[in-house]
Amino acid sequence: MIQRRKPLPRRRAKPRRIRSPRCVVRGCDRLRVVVCPSCERGDRDWEHGYCLTHAKQEADRRFSLAVRSIGRCEGCGQTEGLQCSHFISRRYLGVRWTRLNAECLCRGCHKFLTERPLEARDRARERLSAAVYDELEEQARRFVGPVDYAAVLAKYPPVAKEVA
């Protein structure tokens, strides 16, 4: 009696690709790194999440909306063309999304203070008090390490309506 050999398993032409979660922004195929805190981390079926680039953009958008929700310029009282102005540059990620570091200004006031950094610093020290401003500066200098974007996104929840 002839013994039949077991056939060898067929090899796949292409290895199976393990699908990893991707950023929710249309057209972005980077891995999701930041997830909404309401979702479970590590779950393959995340409903939403962002790559680092889009997490930063979304955090900026939400923070700006929160600051501009005051509805008027804190310099002159105007209600049109409002912008989020930072006392300490957005470059310093340790205080970029700190509410004390921002104020709502119209285009004109924001441009005026951007072009005159000494006046802007004096205004910030006057508005916040010198001690608070110095603490913000120290916090900005001291910060090293990755930003916890999930915490920032949780702090400023999504707002459906844009502010002018």
Tell what function each PLM region has:
Residues M1-R62, Q78-E80, V132-A164:
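A boundary/linker detector
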Residues H48, H54, S85-H86, H110, ...:
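Histidine-centered active-site/metal-ligand motif
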Residues L52-Q57, Y92-V95, H110:
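Short, surface-exposed loop/turn motifs that are enriched in glycine and acidic residues
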Residues R61, L65-C76:
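Betabetaalpha-Me/HNH-type nuclease active-site subdomain
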Residues E74-C104, L113, E119:
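Histidine-centered nuclease catalytic patch
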Residues F112-E119, S129-L136:
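Substrate-binding/catalytic groove segments of enzymes
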